Amino acid sequence: MTLRQDYSHNLFSNQLKNRMKKLLLAALVAFLPFSAIAESNLDKILSAGILKVGTTGDWDPMTMKDPATNKYKGFDIDVMNELAKDMGVKVEFVPAEWKTIVSGITSARYDISTSVTKTPKRAEVAGFTDTYYKYGTVPLVLKKNLKKFSTWNSLNNSKVTIATTLGTSQEEKAKEFFPK
């Protein structure tokens, strides 16, 4: 990587992190439907001095748990550390699973989570900020099978096994697009 590429990457990364911190701080204040409750949630975080963040630790490069150190690392982890620093509190990463990521918020197991896909079902019970990272989901097949599986419809076959992570929005989409 050239110096210019490194600078551009760091500049973009810092701008994105700053934008995300603002969005997430706003989410902490407005996470619950009633502003008084949301404000008390923020007050609770500030008075306890701890921001509890639910994270799965299984989605590189956003959140990964390093088995050597047993600590989390990744883009979302960096942003949450910066957000906590800006708030003047410590951050505590709480292990979470995709299938229960939203219930961890609604049960107050943690205060916030990141990189959670907004779905209508999740939006019924949880608040979401604006998107800070967009990605697409596409089927992945072995290169030698590209001709055999050249369309999405060619994958919708009872003899084809589709694998996803349980509890994710990708699981929902796989069931929708590949019902066979």
PLM features: residue spans?
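Sec-dependent N-terminal signal peptides
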Residues: L23-L32
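Residues embedded in well-ordered beta-strands
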Residues: K52, V138-L140
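Ligand-binding cleft/hinge of the Venus flytrap
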Residues: T63-T69, M80-V89, T151-N156, S169-K180
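Flexible hinge/capping segments at coil-to-helix
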Residues: K143-V160
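Sec/Tat signal peptide C-region and signal peptidase I cleavage site
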Residues: R19, L32-A38
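Extracytoplasmic small-molecule ligand-binding "clamshell" domains
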Residues: S40-V116, E124
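Positively charged n-region of N-terminal signal peptides that target proteins for export
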Residues: K17-L23
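Ligand-binding "clamshell"
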Residues: P67, K121-Y135, P179
